[in-house]
Amino acid sequence: MAKLISSPSRVKAEGKLEKIIEEFIGAVNTGTQNVSIALMTSPAGWEEPGQTPEFDEYSVVIRGTLRAEGRDSVTEAGPGQAIFAARGEWVRYSTPGAEGAQYIAVCLPAFTPVTAHRDE
């Protein structure tokens, strides 16, 4: 049976500027542990600490540019493109463009602050 998720939960974001995280499916909004799906809206110049997560992360860009820095590479995606970051690999996300970015992030299993293993 299909179930309507009528609204997301706002989740506190890390980073120097405020990013809006609206989790539709995941540990916070639905108690789901195996996947999280969130709409992310970040301003120009936003960046978060690096992390070595226990989850795979798929990010589909709707607007702006999303950057993912790895140990040996930098990947940027624009509207209609996606970035995949594998679990166990260090990554740091940012939105370097003047318009910031809006994107959908899907994490398998679900994102939690504990399993993100953010840099200190």
Task: Annotate the PLM regions.
Residues 1-34, 41, 49, 115-120:
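A short, N-terminal "cap"/entry segment at the start of jelly-roll beta-barrel domains
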Residues 30-33, 43-46, 63-66, 109-113:
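Short, charged/polar surface micro-motifs in flexible loops or helix N-caps
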Residues 33-35, 52-53, 96-97:
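Short glycine/proline-enriched turns and hinge-like loops at secondary-structure junctions
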Residues 39-43, 53-70, 106:
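Short, conserved beta-strand element in jelly-roll/cupin
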Residues 40, 84, 99-115:
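A short hydrophobic beta-strand segment most commonly corresponding to one strand
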Residues 48-50, 68-69, 85, 91-98:
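Short beta-strand His + acidic residue motifs that chelate non-heme Fe in jelly-roll/DSBH
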Residues 72-87:
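Short acidic-glycine-tyrosine-enriched beta hairpin
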